[in-house]
Amino acid sequence: MMLSIPDVLNAEQLQQCRAALEGGNWQDGRLTAGHQAVNVKANQQLAQDDPLTQQLGDFILACLAQHPRFMAAALPLKVVPPRFNRYAEGGTYGDHIDNAVFSVPGTPHRIRADLSATLFFSEPEEYEGGELVVQDKRIKLPAGHLILYSSGSLHRVEPVTRGARLASFFWVQSLVRQDEQRSVLLELDDSIQALRQQVPDSPELVRLTGIYHNLLRQWTQT
């Protein structure tokens, strides 16, 4: 699954987040890299225990919970608290695959990474390079937009040669573990929503909605 989700943040929310991030205490991103990733990672991150990380992370989670497209596509059960990175002056992150399981700082909880997400804070014209490359697809979205993709995908961030690229990134444990099943549910949900707009009184809506929930019941893992 790979899906672009527009307008997770509106213009006012984006401006507030950008202002806070530009004054952030950025640290060497290699401090959070694993044994293999440390050799291919060259960026900056906010510390996970930085109050700004926690404040903006909570804000993003609240926005996502109110975004119907994200909820329908990800079917989130648990979300790793959002983190924040900055790429500038040649900053890059070579080919890697995300960890399968993440610990939640300060808790005994672990979260399986089914989906990876990047929320962009910089407009594409503000920097050169910096594309997120997932498999063979190059992604550079407008600020406030989010890309959602399978955590098992090989991906990288191309070197930033001008300007700076600010983003948030996090991982989702979905109610539905398998990408193929999640894609079927999203396609079915899209069809239900379209039918509701076209023929809101159709009895088929009840039937299709029942099929959706029965499939979700069959495939859900909690």
Curated annotation (Swiss-Prot):
It holds the Pfam family 2OG-FeII_Oxy_3. PROSITE patterns: FE2OG_OXY (PS51471). The keyword Cytoplasm does not apply. Keywords: Dioxygenase, Iron, Metal-binding, Oxidoreductase, Vitamin C. Residues 78-174 form the Fe2OG dioxygenase domain. Its cofactor is Fe(2+); L-ascorbate. Binds 1 Fe(2+) ion per subunit. GO terms for molecular function: 2-oxoglutarate-dependent dioxygenase activity; iron ion binding; L-ascorbic acid binding. This is PKHD-type hydroxylase Pmen_0803.
